[in-house]
Every structure is written in structure tokens, then in C-alpha cells.
């Protein structure tokens, strides 16, 4: 009789509680588990990134040793720089506000990392994301996590069917407190470790500094202007501003002023009243759908314009070149180019795209 081989899974280890419990849960379920940590940025002492890398690697290896599973380190610095860090900087330079986690999930965690895992003979990769992956009617679908406060499906809309069939996310069945309780129960020292909230490759959370130090193009100061083009003052470079911003403008106009537009061609930041940042129509590009390959007709659904935003009712309409028009029932505050708009029907993640342009119906 031929003995059935265990399914092999490579878990992306960050040194945090979610990925650590993911590895534990899968080992308990009988998988052959390997812990793998990605090195995605070189690290500098002055901004804290070198210390962060060292902490991630040390913590991840300690957890793997504790769980008695192999630990592997993989260098993805070149891929990360090309697919995440460089586009991140370019977006800011061109007046957009990017979400690097979306780029990273698309190109690194669920592409380059998946390929490395397959090279190791893995059947699956697993991460500590809070989301539910379910097979249904011949498709692999993504549903919101049990813990709606930790749900991370917004970041996963770019995943393709060939990737999803190799991905496990066991944390989706639990809330955060349950995950911490499991970690504590099995004796993991990191059970109370604080969740990371900053951009992973910018530990000091100063994206302006990061771009100035790493971009080949010199960041120029420019003019704050009103809607008619009248100069109101000087700004410190468009990379430092985003739509809807009020604080940190460094300009006094005698009344509240908000960033209502950024014009990279003129190196201008347009200031205006708060009402000007409310719009209800956007065009999204690079759209991906998960339950089906292509949107063929208008559909009413729930749309989110940023990770922390509440979903709002909208209609989406297919356009040419993998784009959609999104029309919200109500005007939304600070729809921002470069961010993602993500679509749901109830708890099912339908897909999403990158916000390319914004307009208003009135």
C-alpha cells in the first residue's frame, strides 16, 4: 500500500501573531508546514528599517523553532523594488496616492512568493490574512472574514484563479482575540505583539522622506493655487499631499482649506472648500473580477474607496480597456486617484481596480 503524502504548505512568516498562529493551525490540521520569510527591502539604520528586518527575521525563526517547522529566508528585494517601491514613488510624483499593499499582494506575496514556494515542492502557500477562501461552482472565491474589524479582503481583489487555488488563509474563521488566545494557549511569546500599521518598508511612516532619499528625480517645491489658478502660497512638493488633506499644509488663509486637486504637470496643489472634495463618479482601471472573468453589464453593488472606508451603494458599468465606471448613490468624501475601489455583493468579494479619474454628476 502506498502511503499518502502530506500536503505541503509554505507559510509567509512576518514574526507577528497572525502568521504564527496560521502556521500552528495548519500543522495541527496535518499539513507539512514550512515557514518562509521574505526579505523585500535592504534596510537602513537611520530610518529604523534595518532594525525592523532583523526583528522580523529573528521573531519568525524563533516561532518556527518553537513550532518545530523548517525556516527559510527568501530574498525578493529586486522584485519588490521593481514592482512595489518604484511604482509607489512614481505614483506620488505623478499626483496619485498609492496603496503599496495592493501592489505587494499582486506581485510579491501571491506571485513571486508563490513561485518560490512551488519551487520548494509546496502545494499551497498560507498567510495570516483575515479572509475566507471558498470553492464554489468551479471557482475559488473570497469572502469577508468572520472578524469584520480585521477583514483584509480589500487588499486581495487582484488575485487570479490560478493563484487562489494554491492559497490558504485559516485566520479568516477567527476574530483577532481568538487568534491571540490560541497564541497564548500554545505558549507563543508574541501573543500580545502589537499589530504593524505603518508601511512595512517605511517604518518611520514618512513617505516623503523615503521618496526624497530613494527617487532619482529631485522633488521640487511649487505653488498652492485656488480653483482659478491664483497663487496662494508655496508647497513643499506634491508628494506630501493627498486629496481631502487639511492638516499640515503650512498655509494660513483665514478659513479652512482642503486639497481638492493635484496637478503634477504644473507642480500645483489646488486648495478649496470642503464641499469640493465630495464626488460620486470615478473611473477605475486595471480591473480584476474573481467570481467571473469579465463584467458584461451594469450591476448594483457595494463599493469601498479605501481600506478604512465604509462600503457604499454604487452601480458599476463596464468600459473598454479593462476599466469600469463607478457611480455612487451618494457623494463620497475624497475619492483619491491611485487608491483602489473594491466591490462586494454582501460578503462576497467581487473584485476591484485602481482609481484613475474622478468626477461629479452635478
UniProtKB/Swiss-Prot annotation:
InterPro entries: MnmA-like, MnmA-like_C, MnmA-like_central, MnmA-like_central_sf, Rossmann-like_a/b/a_fold. One of its GO terms (cellular component) is cytoplasm. It comes from Clostridium tetani (strain Massachusetts / E88). Its EC number is 2.8.1.13. Its main location: cytoplasm. Belongs to the MnmA/TRMU family. One of its GO terms (biological process) is tRNA wobble position uridine thiolation. Gene3D superfamilies: Adenine nucleotide alpha hydrolases-like domains, HUPs, Translation factors. It holds the Pfam family tRNA_Me_trans_M. ATP binds at residues 12-19, 38, 128. This is tRNA-specific 2-thiouridylase MnmA 1. Disulfide bonds join 104-200. The keyword Disulfide bond applies. It catalyses: S-sulfanyl-L-cysteinyl-[protein] + uridine(34) in tRNA + AH2 + ATP = 2-thiouridine(34) in tRNA + L-cysteinyl-[protein] + A + AMP + diphosphate + H(+). Catalyzes the 2-thiolation of uridine at the wobble position (U34) of tRNA, leading to the formation of s(2)U34. Keywords: ATP-binding, Cytoplasm, Disulfide bond, Nucleotide-binding, RNA-binding, Transferase, tRNA processing, tRNA-binding. Residues 150-152, 306-307 are annotated as: Interaction with tRNA. It is found in: Cytoplasm. GO terms for molecular function: ATP binding; tRNA binding; tRNA-uridine 2-sulfurtransferase activity. The record marks 129, 339 as: Interaction with tRNA. The active site is at 104 (nucleophile), 200 (cysteine persulfide intermediate).
Amino acid at each position: 500500500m502506498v502511503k499518502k503524502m502530506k500536503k505541503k504548505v509554505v507559510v509567509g512568516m512576518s514574526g507577528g501573531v497572525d502568521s504564527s498562529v496560521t502556521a500552528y493551525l495548519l500543522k495541527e490540521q496535518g499539513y507539512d508546514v514550512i515557514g518562509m520569510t521574505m526579505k523585500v527591502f535592504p534596510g537602513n539604520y537611520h530610518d529604523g528599517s534595518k532594525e525592523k528586518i532583523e526583528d522580523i527575521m529573528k521573531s519568525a525563526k524563533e516561532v518556527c523553532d518553537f513550532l518545530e517547522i523548517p525556516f527559510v529566508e527568501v530574498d525578493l528585494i529586486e522584485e519588490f523594488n521593481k514592482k512595489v517601491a518604484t511604482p509607489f514613488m512614481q505614483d506620488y510624483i505623478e499626483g496619485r496616492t498609492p496603496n503599496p499593499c495592493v501592489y505587494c499582494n499582486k506581485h510579491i506575496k501571491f506571485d513571486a512568493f508563490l513561485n518560490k514556494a512551488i519551487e520548494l515542492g509546496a502545494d499551497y502557500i498560507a498567510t495570516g490574512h483575515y479572509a475566507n477562501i471558498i470553492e464554489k461552482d468551479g471557482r475559488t472565491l473570497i469572502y469577508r472574514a468572520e472578524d469584520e474589524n480585521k477583514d483584509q479582503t480589500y487588499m486581495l481583489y487582484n488575485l487570479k484563479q490560478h493563484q487562489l487555488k494554491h492559497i490558504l488563509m485559516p485566520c479568516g474563521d477567527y476574530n483577532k482575540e481568538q487568534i491571540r488566545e490560541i497564541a497564548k494557549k500554545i505558549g507563543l511569546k508574541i501573543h500580545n505583539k502589537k499589530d504593524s500599521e505603518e508601511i512595512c518598508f517605511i517604518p518611520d511612516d514618512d513617505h516623503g522622506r523615503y521618496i526624497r532619499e530613494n527617487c532619482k528625480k529631485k522633488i521640487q517645491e511649487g505653488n498652492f493655487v485656488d480653483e482659478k489658478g491664483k497663487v496662494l502660497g508655496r508647497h513643499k512638493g506634491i508628494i506630501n499631499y493627498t486629496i481631502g488633506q487639511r492638516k499640515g499644509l503650512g498655509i494660513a488663509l483665514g478659513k479652512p482649506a482642503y486639497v481638492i486637486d493635484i496637478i503634477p504637470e504644473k507642480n500645483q496643489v489646488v486648495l478649496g472648500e470642503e464641499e469640493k472634495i465630495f464626488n460620486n463618479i470615478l473611473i477605475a482601471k486595471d480591473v480584476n473580477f474573481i467570481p467571473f472573468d469579465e463584467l458584461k453589464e451594469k450591476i448594483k453593488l457595494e463599493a469601498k474607496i479605501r481600506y478604512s472606508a465604509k462600503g457604499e451603494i454604487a452601480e458599476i458599468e463596464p468600459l473598454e480597456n479593462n476599466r469600469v465606471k463607478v457611480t455612487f448613490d451618494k457623494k463620497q468624501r475624497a475619492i483619491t486617484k491611485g487608491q483602489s475601489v473594491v466591490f462586494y455583493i454582501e460578503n462576497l468579494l467581487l473584485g476591484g481596480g485602481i482609481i484613475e479619474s474622478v468626477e461629479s454628476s452635478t
